[in-house]
Amino acid sequence: MTKLTKKQRAVVRQKFGGKCAYCGCELPERWHADHVVPVVRKLKAVKTGHHTYKLVSTGEMHYPENDKLENMYPACVDCNLYKHAASVECFRKMIVDGFRGAVNRSQSLRCAQRFGMLTVTPAADADVIFWFEKYQVEKESLNDQ
């Protein structure tokens, strides 16, 4: 299933009301169909210069069994590129750790924090809840009414 048909893309796009499965933004015209459970593409090193190489996809997958429509979620470009080949739980951790690390590494953010311009609340340590999780809860509560 390397390439989705237009009909399949339309189905994936509407899985969560036309929104990114992760951040919940309205999907723009250009969006990605993400493998929730990664397929992990195989890579090979290609020589580009005297001592330089770049990694390119071979077109093969380590987990081709995950390449199915049920495993595809709609994602905005930013979320999908950041998630890359991570699992949902790993992506959740990447977001929390990335935020904490950004504050710790940035002198301007630490300064803003000292001057009260930036407040890191306990919510920053809370679990990241993705749109698809909220959407499913909302959908279930509507069905219960």
Where do the protein language model's features map onto the residues?
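Extended charged
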Residues: 1-7, 11, 15, 24-28, ...
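Histidine-centered catalytic micro-motifs used for acid/base chemistry in nuclease
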Residues: 32-38, 74
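Compact nucleic-acid interaction/catalytic patches
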Residues: 39-45
